[in-house]
C-alpha cells in the first residue's frame, strides 16, 4: 500500500520477471468483493485473457476505463491478448435455500488444479456455456462445475476460497 506503481513494478519484475502490467482503477468499497480482479478476468495462457463481454462487465460495475484497459491490454511480447468471454448468469442468483441475492454470477472465478478446472455453477442456463468455453481453454483438464450459490451469498467463489500452491 505504501509503494508507488513504479516501485511495485520494479519488485514484480525483479522477483517474477513481469515485464508488462495492466493497472486497473477498480472500485474500492464496492459491495461484494471491492472489484477483485478474479471475479471478472483471468489469464488462460500467455496469449488469452478470459473476461466478460463489455456489457456484462458494465453490469458487473467494472469502470468503463478499466474495461477499455482490459480489452486493449498486451502480453509480455507486446501482442494484444485474445479475449475469451464468459457470460454472466442469465438470472440473478438464488441460493439453494431460496435467498435471492439480487445480482448475477460470474464464471471467471474458476480454479485451475493439476488435472481439473473447478468452475462456479449457479443452477443457471449459462452454466453449460461457461463450462464448455472453459473446457475448450484447458483440453488436458476435466472441467467440473461446482454449485457455489450458497458460497456466493457470502461474497466468494471457488478461486476465493482455495489456497493455490504451485508446483
What label would you give each PLM region?
Residues 1-167:
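Histidine/cysteine-enriched polar flanking segments
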Amino acid at each position: 500500500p505504501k509503494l508507488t506503481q513504479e516501485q511495485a513494478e520494479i519488485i514484480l519484475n525483479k522477483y517474477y520477471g513481469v515485464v508488462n502490467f495492466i493497472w486497473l482503477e477498480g472500485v474500492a468499497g464496492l459491495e461484494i468483493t471491492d472489484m477483485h480482479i478474479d471475479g471478472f478476468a483471468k489469464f488462460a495462457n500467455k496469449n488469452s485473457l478470459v473476461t466478460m463481454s463489455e456489457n456484462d462487465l458494465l453490469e458487473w460495475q467494472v469502470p468503463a476505463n478499466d474495461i477499455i484497459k482490459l480489452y486493449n491490454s498486451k502480453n509480455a511480447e507486446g501482442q494484444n491478448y485474445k479475449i475469451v468471454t464468459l457470460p454472466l448468469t442469465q438470472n440473478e442468483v438464488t441460493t439453494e435455500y431460496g435467498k435471492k441475492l439480487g445480482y448475477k454470477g460470474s464464471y471467471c472465478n474458476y480454479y485451475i488444479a493439476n488435472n481439473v478446472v473447478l468452475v462456479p455453477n449457479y443452477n443457471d442456463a449459462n452454466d453449460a456455456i461457461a463450462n464448455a468455453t472453459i473446457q475448450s481453454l484447458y483440453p488436458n483438464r476435466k472441467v467440473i462445475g461446482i454449485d457455489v450459490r450458497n458460497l456466493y451469498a457470502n461474497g466468494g467463489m471457488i478461486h476465493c476460497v482455495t489456497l493455490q500452491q504451485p508446483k
